[in-house]
Amino acid sequence: MLYLKFLSYVCIGGIYMDGLTCIKRFEIREDYYYAGVKVVSCHIFYPQFIGHHPALDALNNKYYLQAIKKKDNCTNVLYPDAVQALLQGSKVFPYEMIVTITLTLQTNEIASFYQQEYLYTGGANGQTTRIGQTINTLTGEVKHLCDFLQNKKNCETCIKNNIIKQIKTSDDPSIYFDNYPKLVEETFHPQNFYLTSEGVVVFFALYDIAPHSTGIPTFLIPYSQC
């Protein structure tokens, strides 16, 4: 059964006022069955901004279409694959696609959050991916990493050096690959960030600089340090 559900909203001060943007959280969920066995579970959260700037409409449409595309992937890819696996005798069910939203900072003009997708199609581990997004909610503009740091000209170099130093001086550098300085340089992507009240958090994909057991590596860069 498929259903779309409005779950919650976040709004500064808890109310909606002129010039203020609220973030609504919607859910698409559908479970897929074959011969009485639940073979796929699809659970997708996506954001919608309620505000006055027309650019927010384009963002909302983008987030909605991304959610529908993921749901279609459950229907057209995961479900046929799961049915085939079931018919071949596999007992590893259900396959799963779970997409969550975590709001990390909201001010009168900035909303920062990340979406995290977990995809399981059998095997020892599922695949987890994370996408960061920071929006100027007054204009609809998607903000960039260096917009929030002091050293805008050399901010990426400063951040990479900061991350390498954090790993080197951490309690257990062994949770990262031995050649982490080279890997930080090679796999750093400036779009992989979100904001908190303390600073910018930069993250790396699984396996980029550390084994799967480490999880998604994250590094807090205080606003005053770069």
Can you name each region flagged by the protein language model?
Residues 7, 11-226:
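Compositionally biased intrinsically disordered regions enriched in Thr/Gly
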